Each structure stands twice: as structure tokens, then as C-alpha cells.
Amino acid sequence: MLKLPETIKMVITDFDGVVTDNCVYINDDFSMSRKLNFKDVMAFSILKKNGYKIGIISGEKNSAIEILAKKFEVEEVHQNIRVKIDVLKDIIEKYNLDENEFVYIGDDVNDIECLNFAKYKITVPHAVDKVKAVAGIQVT
């Protein structure tokens, strides 16, 4: 598991493509489903058990976010956000965090502003190339 710097107090992440497999499944009734990897769900559990606050800033709105946020008592949940940087700045101000106290995890172009703003930035293997060029760390 990735060891975070000791100064980190909060992990702020995108959802689709970071916690999910970056796919949307269309059911017979035209509802949508997402697949979560238990390793990613376990990461939420480990973060909470180690005293980290968690924030989710998602460009989409879906029930998987709400279920996970409730289960792990996620402090900040923001859905259907197209421009994420303002929400990220609001969270940082609310929790009085400096650049050494949070990490941002993203995978797509709408995360680039947040990744550029963050000192500690992480992405995933299937992130778009522009994000990989910005992120400092890629986790599997």
C-alpha cells in the first residue's frame, strides 16, 4: 500500500475511473450500474481506520457514491460537479488545510486543475495521458 506523507490529513478523490472501473453498464431497464473493485473499497476502510478525512468530488451523480460515503462516513461528498477546482478550494478552506495536508486523486481531464493545484497528486493506470503527465504518483 502507498505510504502517505505524515502531514496528510485528508484524501480528496474523483470517483468514476478512480474507485470504479471507468465503465458504465446499461441494464435492460436502461438504468446504469458501475463496478467497484473491493481493493478500492478497502482503501476507504483503511484510510478511515488510520484517521484520514475523505472527500469525493465527482463529475457524475450516482447512488454508489452515496452508499460508499454513508458506509465510511465520508466527510465531503460533492456530485455532478463539472468544474472541480472551486469545490476543492472550498474543502481546503473549510478544514483549514495547507498544501502539505491533502492529496488529490484523479484520472480525467476535469481533474487536471485540481491535480495542478495539489502538491500531492495521484492517478490510476487507465488515466488519460494528460493526467499522467501532471500526476506525481500512479497507483495500481
Give, region by region, the residue ranges found by the protein language model.
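Short, active-site-adjacent cap segments at secondary-structure transitions
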Residues: 19-20, 63-65, 111
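Short alpha-helix boundary/capping motifs
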Residues: 2, 37-38, 59, 105, ...
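Mg2+-dependent phosphoryl-transfer enzymes with acidic/Ser/Thr/Gly-rich catalytic loops
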Residues: 30, 34, 71, 76-77, ...
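Substrate-recognition element of Asp-dependent hydrolases with the DxDx(T/V) motif
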Residues: 44-68, 79, 115
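Active-site neighborhood of HAD-like aspartate-dependent phosphohydrolases
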Residues: 1-53
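Short beta->alpha linker loops
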Residues: 39, 60-61, 82-83, 126
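Short acidic, glycine/proline-rich loop/turn micro-motifs
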Residues: 24-26, 68, 134
